[in-house]
């Protein structure tokens, strides 16, 4: 299910103060958050950037090893994007493009990355109170991924998200 929310993604708070919010974004395989929402996440959740970058370095920044995958990294309570009284947020990095892919390839990598993310969150849910909606399904908060720097029409990514049994809160301004 996709729910569109007009507002600031970074202002999202889960309904329960014991739940961990997950913010997802599409990112490159180069280990650099240099533009778009990634650059904002780097400022608001600085503790997550070395984890993302290290993950890319571990894979040799090789698109063939990263595209279509995801990595979920925890932030620290001291990060300026976290709010007192709520658990630190998790940042989900979806490896959807290396800037050399067609729109169709990016969409296919997005499908694989979302599938990997869902699997990772279900596993994480065994030990961490990941935010869930009223339906009991995992909630993932995100902007219109791929629609910015990667220039994929939103409708193509939206069709991928609709396939998954997850609640996606898509923030629009």
Swiss-Prot record:
Its EC number is 3.1.3.84. GO terms for molecular function: ADP-ribosyl-[dinitrogen reductase] hydrolase activity; phosphoprotein phosphatase activity. Residues 1-173 form the Macro domain. It holds the Pfam family Macro. It is an enzyme of class 3 (hydrolase). It comes from the Eukaryota. The keyword Hydrolase applies. Keywords: Hydrolase, Protein phosphatase. It catalyses: ADP-alpha-D-ribose 1''-phosphate + H2O = ADP-D-ribose + phosphate. One of its GO terms (biological process) is peptidyl-glutamate ADP-deribosylation. Substrate binds at residues 7-9, 26-28, 33-38, 145-151. Highly specific phosphatase involved in the metabolism of ADP-ribose 1''-phosphate (Appr1p) which is produced as a consequence of tRNA splicing. Belongs to the POA1 family. This is ADP-ribose 1''-phosphate phosphatase.
């Amino acid at each position: 299910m996709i729910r569109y929310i007009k507002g600031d993604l970074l202002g999202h708070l889960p309904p329960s103060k014991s739940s961990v919010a997950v913010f997802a974004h599409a990112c490159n395989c180069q280990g650099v958050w240099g533009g778009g929402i990634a650059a904002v996440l780097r400022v608001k959740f600085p503790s997550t950037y070395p984890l993302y970058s290290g993950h890319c370095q571990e894979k040799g920044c090789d698109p063939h090893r990263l595209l279509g995958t995801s990595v979920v990294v925890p932030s620290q309570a001291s990060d300026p994007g976290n709010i007192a009284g709520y658990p630190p947020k998790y940042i989900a990095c979806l490896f959807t493009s290396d800037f050399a892919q067609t729109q169709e390839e990016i969409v296919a990598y997005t499908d694989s990355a979302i599938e990997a993310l869902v699997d990772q969150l279900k596993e994480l849910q065994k030990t961490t109170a990941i935010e869930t909606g009223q339906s009991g399904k995992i909630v993932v908060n995100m902007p219109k991924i791929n629609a910015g720097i990667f220039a994929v029409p939103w409708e193509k990514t939206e069709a991928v998200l609709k396939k998954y049994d997850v609640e996606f809160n898509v923030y629009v301004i």
